[in-house]
Amino acid sequence: MNLRPEEISSIIKQQIERYDSAVEVVDVGTVIQVGDGIARVHGLEKAMSGELLEFPGGIYGMAMNLEEDNIGCIILGKFTEIREGDQVKRTGRIVEVPVGEAMIGRVVNALGQPIDGKGEIKTDKFRPIENTAPGVVYRKSVHEPLQTGLKSIDAIVPIGRGQRELIIGDRQTGKTAVAVDTIINQKGKDVICIYVAVGQKASTVAGVVKTLADHGAMDYSIVVSATASEPAPMLYIAPYSGCAMGEEFMYNGKHVLIIYDDLTKQAAAYRELSLLLKRPPGREAYPGDVFYLHSRLLERAAKLSPDLGSGSMTALPIIETQAGDVSAYIPTNVISITDGQIFLETDLFNAGFRPAINVGISVSRVGGSAQIKAMKQVAGQLRLDLAQYRELAAFAQFGSDLDKITQMRLTRGERMMEILKQKQYEPMVVEEQVVVLYAAVKGFLDDIPVDKIKSFEEDYLRTMRTTKADLLAKIRTEKALNDELNAEIEKAITEVKEGFLG
Protein backbone atom coordinates (compact mmCIF):
# COMPACT_ATOMS: atom_id res chain seq x y z
CA MET A 1 0.00 0.00 0.00
CA ASN A 2 1.55 3.29 -1.14
CA LEU A 3 0.88 6.47 0.83
CA ARG A 4 1.75 9.78 -0.72
CA PRO A 5 3.54 12.29 1.53
CA GLU A 6 0.80 14.93 1.00
CA GLU A 7 -1.84 12.43 2.28
CA ILE A 8 0.19 11.80 5.44
CA SER A 9 0.54 15.51 6.10
CA SER A 10 -3.25 16.11 5.57
CA ILE A 11 -4.11 13.26 8.03
CA ILE A 12 -1.74 14.77 10.61
CA LYS A 13 -3.33 18.22 10.08
CA GLN A 14 -6.85 16.75 10.58
CA GLN A 15 -5.74 15.04 13.80
CA ILE A 16 -4.25 18.32 15.06
CA GLU A 17 -7.50 20.17 14.25
CA ARG A 18 -9.57 17.54 16.09
CA TYR A 19 -7.35 17.60 19.18
CA ASP A 20 -9.32 18.95 22.14
CA SER A 21 -7.05 20.73 24.57
CA ALA A 22 -9.85 21.43 27.08
CA VAL A 23 -9.07 20.31 30.61
CA GLU A 24 -11.81 19.07 32.94
CA VAL A 25 -11.49 20.99 36.18
CA VAL A 26 -12.77 19.08 39.21
CA ASP A 27 -12.90 20.52 42.71
CA VAL A 28 -11.30 17.82 44.87
CA GLY A 29 -10.89 17.56 48.63
CA THR A 30 -9.42 15.05 51.07
CA VAL A 31 -11.06 13.11 53.90
CA ILE A 32 -9.30 14.06 57.14
CA GLN A 33 -11.63 12.24 59.56
CA VAL A 34 -14.42 9.67 59.18
CA GLY A 35 -16.76 7.72 61.48
CA ASP A 36 -20.38 7.32 62.64
CA GLY A 37 -21.80 8.38 59.27
CA ILE A 38 -19.86 11.68 59.33
CA ALA A 39 -16.78 12.71 57.32
CA ARG A 40 -14.67 15.85 57.62
CA VAL A 41 -13.27 16.97 54.27
CA HIS A 42 -10.47 19.47 53.68
CA GLY A 43 -10.00 21.44 50.46
CA LEU A 44 -13.52 21.97 49.07
CA GLU A 45 -13.65 25.75 49.59
CA LYS A 46 -16.49 26.31 47.10
CA ALA A 47 -18.85 23.55 48.29
CA MET A 48 -22.41 24.68 49.00
CA SER A 49 -24.65 23.73 51.91
CA GLY A 50 -26.62 20.58 51.06
CA GLU A 51 -24.43 19.82 48.01
CA LEU A 52 -23.92 16.23 46.90
CA LEU A 53 -20.29 15.08 47.26
CA GLU A 54 -18.80 11.99 45.60
CA PHE A 55 -16.57 9.61 47.59
CA PRO A 56 -14.60 6.67 46.11
CA GLY A 57 -16.54 3.47 45.37
CA GLY A 58 -19.74 5.22 44.25
CA ILE A 59 -20.62 6.41 47.77
CA TYR A 60 -22.17 9.85 48.10
CA GLY A 61 -22.35 12.37 50.91
CA MET A 62 -24.08 15.67 51.63
CA ALA A 63 -22.35 18.83 52.86
CA MET A 64 -23.90 19.97 56.15
CA ASN A 65 -21.35 22.10 58.04
CA LEU A 66 -19.33 24.69 56.08
CA GLU A 67 -16.47 25.62 58.40
CA GLU A 68 -13.35 27.76 57.96
CA ASP A 69 -10.89 25.01 57.12
CA ASN A 70 -13.06 21.94 56.48
CA ILE A 71 -16.53 20.65 55.62
CA GLY A 72 -18.61 18.37 57.85
CA CYS A 73 -20.65 16.06 55.64
CA ILE A 74 -23.04 13.17 56.22
CA ILE A 75 -22.38 9.94 54.30
CA LEU A 76 -25.33 8.42 52.44
CA GLY A 77 -24.27 4.80 52.44
CA LYS A 78 -21.63 2.55 54.00
CA PHE A 79 -19.28 4.93 55.80
CA THR A 80 -17.08 1.96 56.85
CA GLU A 81 -15.70 1.77 53.28
CA ILE A 82 -14.31 5.33 53.41
CA ARG A 83 -10.76 5.92 54.66
CA GLU A 84 -8.80 8.98 55.77
CA GLY A 85 -6.93 10.42 52.80
CA ASP A 86 -9.61 9.42 50.25
CA GLN A 87 -10.39 11.97 47.54
CA VAL A 88 -13.80 13.67 47.52
CA LYS A 89 -15.28 15.44 44.48
CA ARG A 90 -17.91 18.16 44.27
CA THR A 91 -20.86 17.41 41.98
CA GLY A 92 -22.51 20.85 41.89
CA ARG A 93 -25.90 19.15 42.49
CA ILE A 94 -28.07 18.52 45.51
CA VAL A 95 -29.38 15.08 46.49
CA GLU A 96 -31.99 13.80 44.02
CA VAL A 97 -34.23 10.74 44.00
CA PRO A 98 -35.93 8.95 41.09
CA VAL A 99 -39.64 9.78 40.75
CA GLY A 100 -42.60 8.95 38.51
CA GLU A 101 -45.02 6.15 37.70
CA ALA A 102 -42.23 3.53 37.68
CA MET A 103 -41.90 3.91 41.47
CA ILE A 104 -45.46 2.69 42.17
CA GLY A 105 -45.59 -0.79 43.67
CA ARG A 106 -41.92 -0.72 44.68
CA VAL A 107 -40.04 -0.77 47.99
CA VAL A 108 -37.03 1.58 47.92
CA ASN A 109 -34.41 2.92 50.32
CA ALA A 110 -33.94 6.60 51.24
CA LEU A 111 -32.03 7.23 47.97
CA GLY A 112 -34.80 5.70 45.85
CA GLN A 113 -32.80 2.52 45.11
CA PRO A 114 -34.94 -0.66 44.95
CA ILE A 115 -34.64 -3.09 47.87
CA ASP A 116 -37.50 -5.45 46.95
CA GLY A 117 -35.56 -7.73 44.59
CA LYS A 118 -37.76 -6.84 41.59
CA GLY A 119 -34.97 -5.41 39.45
CA GLU A 120 -34.00 -1.84 38.64
CA ILE A 121 -36.49 1.01 38.39
CA LYS A 122 -36.65 2.37 34.84
CA THR A 123 -37.28 6.10 35.10
CA ASP A 124 -35.50 9.14 33.71
CA LYS A 125 -37.21 11.58 36.08
CA PHE A 126 -35.44 12.87 39.19
CA ARG A 127 -36.37 15.46 41.79
CA PRO A 128 -34.26 17.12 44.50
CA ILE A 129 -35.20 15.91 47.99
CA GLU A 130 -35.34 19.51 49.27
CA ASN A 131 -37.90 21.73 47.57
CA THR A 132 -39.63 24.99 48.43
CA ALA A 133 -43.20 24.56 49.70
CA PRO A 134 -45.95 26.11 47.52
CA GLY A 135 -46.72 29.74 48.47
CA VAL A 136 -50.07 31.05 49.70
CA VAL A 137 -51.27 32.14 46.24
CA TYR A 138 -50.60 28.67 44.81
CA ARG A 139 -52.79 26.91 47.38
CA LYS A 140 -56.50 26.34 47.69
CA SER A 141 -58.34 25.76 50.95
CA VAL A 142 -58.86 22.09 51.85
CA HIS A 143 -62.38 21.12 50.78
CA GLU A 144 -62.35 17.51 49.47
CA PRO A 145 -62.63 14.65 51.98
CA LEU A 146 -59.94 11.99 52.23
CA GLN A 147 -61.81 9.03 53.72
CA THR A 148 -59.84 6.87 56.15
CA GLY A 149 -62.60 4.25 56.41
CA LEU A 150 -62.51 4.59 60.22
CA LYS A 151 -65.80 5.80 61.72
CA SER A 152 -64.23 7.67 64.64
CA ILE A 153 -61.93 9.67 62.32
CA ASP A 154 -64.25 10.33 59.37
CA ALA A 155 -67.07 11.46 61.68
CA ILE A 156 -65.27 13.37 64.44
CA VAL A 157 -61.80 14.36 63.13
CA PRO A 158 -62.28 14.43 59.33
CA ILE A 159 -59.23 14.65 57.09
CA GLY A 160 -59.27 16.60 53.81
CA ARG A 161 -57.05 16.30 50.74
CA GLY A 162 -54.04 18.56 51.28
CA GLN A 163 -54.28 18.52 55.07
CA ARG A 164 -51.52 17.64 57.59
CA GLU A 165 -53.04 15.55 60.39
CA LEU A 166 -50.79 14.24 63.15
CA ILE A 167 -51.25 10.73 64.57
CA ILE A 168 -49.80 10.76 68.08
CA GLY A 169 -49.65 8.21 70.89
CA ASP A 170 -47.46 5.91 72.95
CA ARG A 171 -45.85 2.81 71.46
CA GLN A 172 -48.20 -0.11 70.74
CA THR A 173 -51.39 1.98 70.58
CA GLY A 174 -52.19 1.28 66.90
CA LYS A 175 -50.70 4.35 65.16
CA THR A 176 -49.35 2.39 62.19
CA ALA A 177 -52.63 0.41 62.02
CA VAL A 178 -54.60 3.66 61.52
CA ALA A 179 -52.19 4.71 58.74
CA VAL A 180 -52.28 1.31 57.00
CA ASP A 181 -56.10 1.19 57.18
CA THR A 182 -56.19 4.63 55.54
CA ILE A 183 -53.96 3.39 52.69
CA ILE A 184 -56.14 0.28 52.18
CA ASN A 185 -59.25 2.51 52.06
CA GLN A 186 -57.83 4.52 49.12
CA LYS A 187 -58.35 1.56 46.76
CA GLY A 188 -60.19 2.72 43.64
CA LYS A 189 -60.15 6.38 44.75
CA ASP A 190 -57.29 7.46 42.45
CA VAL A 191 -54.97 8.37 45.35
CA ILE A 192 -51.28 7.42 45.26
CA CYS A 193 -50.03 6.40 48.71
CA ILE A 194 -46.47 6.68 50.01
CA TYR A 195 -45.47 4.98 53.25
CA VAL A 196 -42.16 6.25 54.68
CA ALA A 197 -40.79 3.96 57.40
CA VAL A 198 -38.14 5.71 59.51
CA GLY A 199 -36.17 3.74 62.10
CA GLN A 200 -38.56 0.77 62.10
CA LYS A 201 -37.43 -2.84 62.39
CA ALA A 202 -36.96 -4.44 58.96
CA SER A 203 -39.41 -7.19 60.00
CA THR A 204 -42.07 -4.56 60.82
CA VAL A 205 -41.66 -2.90 57.40
CA ALA A 206 -41.85 -6.32 55.70
CA GLY A 207 -45.10 -6.96 57.62
CA VAL A 208 -46.60 -3.66 56.43
CA VAL A 209 -45.59 -4.38 52.81
CA LYS A 210 -47.16 -7.86 53.02
CA THR A 211 -50.40 -6.43 54.49
CA LEU A 212 -50.60 -3.82 51.70
CA ALA A 213 -49.90 -6.47 49.05
CA ASP A 214 -52.52 -8.85 50.50
CA HIS A 215 -55.17 -6.10 50.26
CA GLY A 216 -54.13 -5.06 46.74
CA ALA A 217 -52.85 -1.71 48.01
CA MET A 218 -49.30 -2.00 46.57
CA ASP A 219 -50.85 -1.34 43.13
CA TYR A 220 -51.05 2.36 44.06
CA SER A 221 -48.40 2.60 46.80
CA ILE A 222 -44.68 3.29 47.22
CA VAL A 223 -42.80 2.20 50.36
CA VAL A 224 -39.67 4.15 51.35
CA SER A 225 -37.75 2.29 54.02
CA ALA A 226 -34.89 3.51 56.23
CA THR A 227 -34.73 0.79 58.88
CA ALA A 228 -33.18 1.00 62.35
CA SER A 229 -30.06 -0.85 61.12
CA GLU A 230 -29.20 1.88 58.60
CA PRO A 231 -26.91 4.85 59.36
CA ALA A 232 -28.49 8.02 60.79
CA PRO A 233 -28.08 10.04 57.51
CA MET A 234 -30.47 7.64 55.73
CA LEU A 235 -33.09 8.03 58.49
CA TYR A 236 -32.69 11.82 58.26
CA ILE A 237 -33.27 12.09 54.49
CA ALA A 238 -35.94 9.36 54.07
CA PRO A 239 -39.00 11.62 54.74
CA TYR A 240 -37.69 14.25 52.27
CA SER A 241 -37.13 11.54 49.63
CA GLY A 242 -40.71 10.26 50.07
CA CYS A 243 -42.02 13.82 49.88
CA ALA A 244 -40.14 14.47 46.61
CA MET A 245 -41.72 11.33 45.10
CA GLY A 246 -45.15 12.60 46.18
CA GLU A 247 -44.56 16.10 44.79
CA GLU A 248 -43.98 14.69 41.30
CA PHE A 249 -47.56 13.35 41.31
CA MET A 250 -49.04 16.39 43.11
CA TYR A 251 -47.63 18.88 40.57
CA ASN A 252 -49.08 16.68 37.80
CA GLY A 253 -52.61 17.16 39.14
CA LYS A 254 -52.86 13.89 41.08
CA HIS A 255 -53.79 13.20 44.71
CA VAL A 256 -51.20 11.80 47.10
CA LEU A 257 -51.36 10.46 50.67
CA ILE A 258 -48.00 10.32 52.46
CA ILE A 259 -47.37 8.73 55.85
CA TYR A 260 -44.21 9.44 57.87
CA ASP A 261 -43.80 6.60 60.38
CA ASP A 262 -42.40 8.14 62.48
CA LEU A 263 -40.89 11.61 62.78
CA THR A 264 -39.71 11.05 66.37
CA LYS A 265 -37.03 8.71 65.01
CA GLN A 266 -36.10 11.18 62.27
CA ALA A 267 -35.62 13.89 64.92
CA ALA A 268 -33.44 11.49 66.97
CA ALA A 269 -31.33 10.72 63.87
CA TYR A 270 -30.95 14.45 63.16
CA ARG A 271 -29.95 15.06 66.79
CA GLU A 272 -27.30 12.35 66.45
CA LEU A 273 -25.89 13.92 63.27
CA SER A 274 -25.95 17.43 64.74
CA LEU A 275 -24.09 16.37 67.88
CA LEU A 276 -21.50 14.47 65.81
CA LEU A 277 -21.06 17.60 63.65
CA LYS A 278 -20.43 19.54 66.90
CA ARG A 279 -23.47 21.79 66.48
CA PRO A 280 -24.58 23.40 69.77
CA PRO A 281 -27.32 21.37 71.54
CA GLY A 282 -30.55 22.96 72.79
CA ARG A 283 -33.61 21.64 74.63
CA GLU A 284 -33.50 17.84 75.16
CA ALA A 285 -30.11 17.98 73.31
CA TYR A 286 -31.89 18.64 69.98
CA PRO A 287 -30.26 21.27 67.74
CA GLY A 288 -31.83 24.73 67.47
CA ASP A 289 -33.28 24.08 63.99
CA VAL A 290 -35.22 20.89 64.83
CA PHE A 291 -38.51 22.81 64.36
CA TYR A 292 -37.40 23.75 60.84
CA LEU A 293 -36.52 20.07 60.21
CA HIS A 294 -40.22 19.17 60.44
CA SER A 295 -41.86 22.42 59.28
CA ARG A 296 -40.06 22.48 55.91
CA LEU A 297 -41.14 18.87 55.36
CA LEU A 298 -44.81 19.19 56.37
CA GLU A 299 -45.36 22.56 54.65
CA ARG A 300 -44.75 20.81 51.32
CA ALA A 301 -48.11 19.03 51.75
CA ALA A 302 -50.79 21.18 50.13
CA LYS A 303 -53.96 21.41 48.08
CA LEU A 304 -52.85 23.22 44.93
CA SER A 305 -54.84 25.90 43.13
CA PRO A 306 -56.46 25.12 39.72
CA ASP A 307 -53.63 27.12 38.02
CA LEU A 308 -51.18 24.45 39.19
CA GLY A 309 -53.45 21.52 38.30
CA SER A 310 -55.51 21.12 41.53
CA GLY A 311 -53.31 18.26 42.78
CA SER A 312 -52.92 17.56 46.49
CA MET A 313 -50.60 15.90 48.98
CA THR A 314 -52.07 14.88 52.33
CA ALA A 315 -49.54 14.19 55.09
CA LEU A 316 -50.13 11.94 58.09
CA PRO A 317 -47.03 12.29 60.27
CA ILE A 318 -46.76 9.90 63.23
CA ILE A 319 -45.18 10.88 66.56
CA GLU A 320 -44.46 8.49 69.41
CA THR A 321 -44.88 9.86 72.94
CA GLN A 322 -43.41 8.62 76.22
CA ALA A 323 -46.09 7.77 78.82
CA GLY A 324 -48.64 10.02 77.09
CA ASP A 325 -46.50 13.17 77.47
CA VAL A 326 -47.64 15.39 74.60
CA SER A 327 -45.89 18.44 76.10
CA ALA A 328 -42.40 17.12 75.23
CA TYR A 329 -40.34 19.06 72.68
CA ILE A 330 -40.95 17.14 69.43
CA PRO A 331 -44.70 16.44 70.03
CA THR A 332 -45.43 20.15 70.74
CA ASN A 333 -43.43 21.19 67.66
CA VAL A 334 -45.32 18.89 65.31
CA ILE A 335 -48.71 19.67 66.92
CA SER A 336 -48.08 23.36 66.18
CA ILE A 337 -47.15 22.64 62.53
CA THR A 338 -50.04 20.32 61.65
CA ASP A 339 -53.76 21.03 61.03
CA GLY A 340 -54.98 18.84 63.87
CA GLN A 341 -54.08 15.67 65.71
CA ILE A 342 -55.47 12.21 66.41
CA PHE A 343 -54.58 11.06 69.94
CA LEU A 344 -54.31 7.33 70.58
CA GLU A 345 -54.35 6.24 74.22
CA THR A 346 -52.90 3.16 75.92
CA ASP A 347 -55.81 2.95 78.41
CA LEU A 348 -58.41 2.86 75.62
CA PHE A 349 -56.34 0.31 73.69
CA ASN A 350 -56.02 -1.97 76.71
CA ALA A 351 -59.75 -1.61 77.44
CA GLY A 352 -60.49 -3.06 73.99
CA PHE A 353 -61.59 0.23 72.40
CA ARG A 354 -59.90 0.04 69.02
CA PRO A 355 -58.94 2.14 67.16
CA ALA A 356 -57.88 3.66 70.52
CA ILE A 357 -58.71 7.23 69.50
CA ASN A 358 -59.55 9.69 72.25
CA VAL A 359 -62.32 11.55 70.42
CA GLY A 360 -62.43 14.18 73.17
CA ILE A 361 -58.99 15.69 72.63
CA SER A 362 -58.47 14.74 68.97
CA VAL A 363 -59.18 17.67 66.64
CA SER A 364 -59.16 18.52 62.96
CA ARG A 365 -58.67 22.20 62.19
CA VAL A 366 -60.19 21.69 58.74
CA GLY A 367 -63.41 20.29 60.22
CA GLY A 368 -66.69 19.99 58.34
CA SER A 369 -65.33 21.32 55.04
CA ALA A 370 -63.62 17.92 54.67
CA GLN A 371 -66.87 15.96 55.06
CA ILE A 372 -69.76 15.18 52.74
CA LYS A 373 -73.01 16.83 53.89
CA ALA A 374 -74.61 13.52 54.94
CA MET A 375 -71.73 12.80 57.32
CA LYS A 376 -71.85 16.36 58.65
CA GLN A 377 -75.56 15.91 59.44
CA VAL A 378 -74.98 12.86 61.66
CA ALA A 379 -71.52 13.74 63.00
CA GLY A 380 -72.55 17.08 64.55
CA GLN A 381 -74.98 15.37 66.92
CA LEU A 382 -72.51 12.54 67.57
CA ARG A 383 -69.77 14.93 68.69
CA LEU A 384 -72.15 16.74 71.05
CA ASP A 385 -73.59 13.54 72.55
CA LEU A 386 -70.13 12.08 73.16
CA ALA A 387 -68.95 15.27 74.88
CA GLN A 388 -71.99 15.15 77.20
CA TYR A 389 -71.44 11.44 77.82
CA ARG A 390 -67.79 11.94 78.86
CA GLU A 391 -68.79 14.72 81.27
CA LEU A 392 -71.65 12.73 82.82
CA ALA A 393 -69.67 9.46 82.98
CA ALA A 394 -67.09 11.17 85.20
CA PHE A 395 -69.83 12.31 87.66
CA ALA A 396 -71.85 9.07 87.46
CA GLN A 397 -69.01 7.18 89.16
CA PHE A 398 -69.80 9.01 92.41
CA GLY A 399 -73.59 8.67 92.53
CA SER A 400 -76.17 5.98 91.82
CA ASP A 401 -79.44 7.99 91.98
CA LEU A 402 -79.38 9.53 88.51
CA ASP A 403 -82.38 11.21 86.88
CA LYS A 404 -83.94 9.75 83.73
CA ILE A 405 -82.35 12.21 81.27
CA THR A 406 -78.85 11.59 82.68
CA GLN A 407 -79.48 7.84 82.59
CA MET A 408 -80.63 8.09 78.96
CA ARG A 409 -77.53 10.09 77.93
CA LEU A 410 -75.23 7.59 79.62
CA THR A 411 -77.04 4.69 77.92
CA ARG A 412 -76.75 6.34 74.50
CA GLY A 413 -73.11 7.34 75.08
CA GLU A 414 -72.11 3.76 75.93
CA ARG A 415 -73.66 2.53 72.70
CA MET A 416 -72.02 5.29 70.67
CA MET A 417 -68.61 4.36 72.06
CA GLU A 418 -69.34 0.73 71.18
CA ILE A 419 -70.41 1.57 67.62
CA LEU A 420 -67.15 3.49 67.02
CA LYS A 421 -65.12 0.32 67.58
CA GLN A 422 -63.77 -1.21 64.39
CA LYS A 423 -61.63 -4.20 63.44
CA GLN A 424 -58.26 -3.70 61.79
CA TYR A 425 -58.03 -3.85 57.97
CA GLU A 426 -61.82 -3.47 57.65
CA PRO A 427 -62.28 0.12 56.47
CA MET A 428 -65.89 1.16 55.89
CA VAL A 429 -67.20 3.22 52.97
CA VAL A 430 -68.72 6.58 53.88
CA GLU A 431 -72.36 5.74 53.05
CA GLU A 432 -72.23 2.72 55.39
CA GLN A 433 -70.68 4.88 58.11
CA VAL A 434 -73.55 7.37 57.71
CA VAL A 435 -76.32 4.76 58.13
CA VAL A 436 -74.60 3.14 61.14
CA LEU A 437 -73.98 6.45 62.93
CA TYR A 438 -77.53 7.58 62.09
CA ALA A 439 -78.87 4.60 64.05
CA ALA A 440 -76.70 5.57 67.05
CA VAL A 441 -77.44 9.32 67.19
CA LYS A 442 -81.19 8.89 66.67
CA GLY A 443 -81.43 6.54 69.67
CA PHE A 444 -82.33 3.36 67.77
CA LEU A 445 -79.65 1.43 69.67
CA ASP A 446 -80.72 2.58 73.16
CA ASP A 447 -82.71 -0.60 73.91
CA ILE A 448 -80.10 -3.02 72.51
CA PRO A 449 -77.69 -4.46 75.14
CA VAL A 450 -74.14 -3.05 74.79
CA ASP A 451 -72.61 -6.51 74.24
CA LYS A 452 -75.01 -7.10 71.31
CA ILE A 453 -74.26 -3.80 69.51
CA LYS A 454 -71.50 -5.22 67.24
CA SER A 455 -73.61 -8.20 66.13
CA PHE A 456 -76.55 -5.84 65.45
CA GLU A 457 -74.23 -3.65 63.35
CA GLU A 458 -73.17 -6.70 61.31
CA ASP A 459 -76.81 -7.74 60.69
CA TYR A 460 -77.77 -4.17 59.83
CA LEU A 461 -74.92 -3.72 57.32
CA ARG A 462 -75.59 -7.13 55.75
CA THR A 463 -79.22 -6.10 55.15
CA MET A 464 -78.16 -2.70 53.80
CA ARG A 465 -75.67 -4.23 51.35
CA THR A 466 -78.12 -6.83 50.04
CA THR A 467 -81.74 -5.64 50.13
CA LYS A 468 -81.12 -1.88 50.57
CA ALA A 469 -78.17 -1.38 48.21
CA ASP A 470 -80.14 1.28 46.29
CA LEU A 471 -80.46 3.34 49.49
CA LEU A 472 -76.68 3.27 50.01
CA ALA A 473 -76.21 4.23 46.35
CA LYS A 474 -78.53 7.25 46.82
CA ILE A 475 -76.50 8.47 49.82
CA ARG A 476 -73.28 7.98 47.81
CA THR A 477 -74.53 10.02 44.86
CA GLU A 478 -76.59 12.70 46.63
CA LYS A 479 -74.05 13.07 49.50
CA ALA A 480 -76.77 14.54 51.73
CA LEU A 481 -79.69 13.26 53.79
CA ASN A 482 -83.25 14.51 53.25
CA ASP A 483 -86.60 13.60 54.83
CA GLU A 484 -87.21 10.86 52.29
CA LEU A 485 -83.82 9.19 52.87
CA ASN A 486 -84.16 9.58 56.65
CA ALA A 487 -87.52 7.75 56.52
CA GLU A 488 -86.00 4.94 54.42
CA ILE A 489 -83.05 4.55 56.83
CA GLU A 490 -85.36 4.52 59.87
CA LYS A 491 -87.60 1.92 58.21
CA ALA A 492 -84.58 -0.30 57.48
CA ILE A 493 -83.29 0.03 61.08
CA THR A 494 -86.72 -0.87 62.51
CA GLU A 495 -87.02 -3.95 60.26
CA VAL A 496 -83.55 -5.25 61.22
CA LYS A 497 -84.19 -4.49 64.89
CA GLU A 498 -87.46 -6.45 64.94
CA GLY A 499 -85.71 -9.48 63.50
CA PHE A 500 -82.70 -9.03 65.82
CA LEU A 501 -84.61 -8.61 69.10
CA GLY A 502 -87.17 -11.24 68.08
Swiss-Prot record:
One of its GO terms (cellular component) is plasma membrane. It comes from the Bacteria. PROSITE patterns: ATPASE_ALPHA_BETA. The record marks 362 as: Required for activity. Its main location: membrane. It is a peripheral membrane protein. It is found in: Cell membrane. One of its GO terms (molecular function) is proton-transporting ATP synthase activity, rotational mechanism. ATP binds at residues 169-176. Keywords: ATP synthesis, ATP-binding, Cell membrane, CF(1), Hydrogen ion transport, Ion transport, Membrane, Nucleotide-binding, Translocase, Transport. Belongs to the ATPase alpha/beta chains family. F-type ATPases have 2 components, CF(1) - the catalytic core - and CF(0) - the membrane proton channel. CF(1) has five subunits: alpha(3), beta(3), gamma(1), delta(1), epsilon(1). CF(0) has three main subunits: a(1), b(2) and c(9-12). The alpha and beta chains form an alternating ring which encloses part of the gamma chain. CF(1) is attached to CF(0) by a central stalk formed by the gamma and epsilon chains, while a peripheral stalk is formed by the delta and b chains. Produces ATP from ADP in the presence of a proton gradient across the membrane. The alpha chain is a regulatory subunit. This is ATP synthase subunit alpha. The gene is atpA.
